[in-house]
Amino acid sequence: MTQYFDEQPTVPSDRRIVVWALPDGPLTITTDRGVFGHGTVDAGTKLLLLKAPTPPQPGALLDLGCGTGAIALTMARRAPASTVWAIDINARARDLCRANAQRNEIDNVTVAHPDEVPDTLRFAAIWSNPPIRVGKDALHDLLLRWLPRLRPAAQAHLVVQKHLGADSLQRWLIDHDLPTERIATGAGFRVLRACPADHSPAGHDS
């Protein structure tokens, strides 16, 4: 089966629309096969968006592994003076995220392949429902690539399913100079808040 972390999904398209009522207004999302969250907004994403604090603004924000864009669009709506970078290696996901931003009339989202993000860009916040099923080594590489790019005192909020290793991931982050605490639990998921130590090289945030 084609996985949602493939660059070019080969599974036939089957687009479905989801309307999700959030406290700050409804969000209409087109989903598709080959992209995480087909036909639904998953419970982990819901928990993250209900429990994460309002994103800072102005500045650059990051949705790591954007999928259909539910997280990125919510960040953008809550922080209209910020620019949200929605990144994913999956080309179908990027297309959906762009279309969903347009559908919801949200214009402060930049959708990109991870390699298109400027090396000097630093983020005021990162939100992510990371691709746990990509494998432990690949996941660790992903987090070590992006979390150190937070601005000083900035935070990352990650949602991870408990039975897929949320607690062990928290310990691993702490062991890698990424102090992390659990801020919420629900529906079998944990929301983790990571506040990396200030060792990032200088960069810009817009």
Predicted region positions:
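General small-molecule cofactor/ligand-binding pocket signal
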Residues: 30, 110-112, 181-183
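A short glycine-rich, Lys/Arg-flanked "PGG" loop and its adjoining helix->strand segment in the class I
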Residues: 140-152
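Core SAM-dependent methyltransferase catalytic element
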Residues: 185-206
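Conserved beta-strand signature within the Rossmann-like core of class I S-adenosyl-L-methionine
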Residues: 153-160
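Conserved class I S-adenosyl-L-methionine
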Residues: 161-176
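N-terminal auxiliary segments of SAM/dcSAM-dependent transferases
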Residues: 1-22, 34, 38
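Conserved SAM/SAH cofactor-binding pocket of Class I
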Residues: 43-128
